[in-house]
């Protein structure tokens, strides 16, 4: 076997007359990766188009704003090719706000349930759950759902629901009579 090839395989192309043939690593490419809160929460596969190429990307669950997802070998041309660096940008969510690992949202509670207590349905990033409303719950009260927040290195954060009391927009005559009776009883007591 040719000794020149043998030494190039052992020590690289820079020895024994291989100068100038050394290849360079391709440049890393940076691109923005906009994600919904649900996509960032659950993770999964996503196909993105960067520089005219479609690339399949694995998104880890619980990825954060500003995190960088590296896709090896999908950057600029070279030997070896550079990497593709995708910088995560979380899109605004219509319901939830993320702070650290905790999520915040508003929970609409009908007035009768706020007064006497009961159960209402609340949304989480994993789907709906039933929340127990204690009697005489005031507007603005924060209810904490442990472990229903965002995943992170120290486990899951919490979901904080701020109570917003709602009153019915339409009443049947019977319901209106009951509300009037309730108002009379309240004013008689005051």
Predicted regions, residues:
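Non-catalytic interaction modules of co-chaperones and other macromolecular assembly/maintenance factors
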Residues: 1-190
């Amino acid at each position: 076997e040719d000794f020149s090839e043998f030494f190039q395989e052992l020590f690289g192309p820079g020895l024994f007359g291989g100068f100038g043939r050394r290849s360079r690593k391709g440049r890393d490419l940076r691109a923005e990766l906009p994600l919904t809160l649900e996509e960032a929460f659950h993770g999964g596969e996503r196909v993105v188009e960067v520089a005219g190429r479609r690339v399949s990307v694995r998104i880890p669950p619980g990825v954060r704003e500003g995190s960088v997802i590296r896709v090896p070998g999908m950057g600029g041309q070279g030997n070896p090719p550079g990497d593709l660096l995708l910088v995560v940008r979380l899109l605004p969510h219509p319901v939830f706000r993320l702070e650290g690992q905790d999520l915040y949202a508003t929970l609409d509670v009908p007035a009768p349930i706020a007064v006497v207590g009961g159960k209402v349905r609340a949304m989480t990033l994993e789907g709906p759950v039933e929340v127990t409303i204690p009697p005489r719950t005031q507007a603005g009260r924060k209810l904490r759902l442990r472990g229903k927040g965002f995943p992170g290195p120290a486990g899951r954060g919490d979901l904080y629901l701020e109570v917003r009391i709602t009153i019915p927009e339409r009443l049947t005559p019977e319901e209106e009579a009951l509300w009037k009776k309730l108002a009379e009883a309240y004013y008689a007591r005051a």
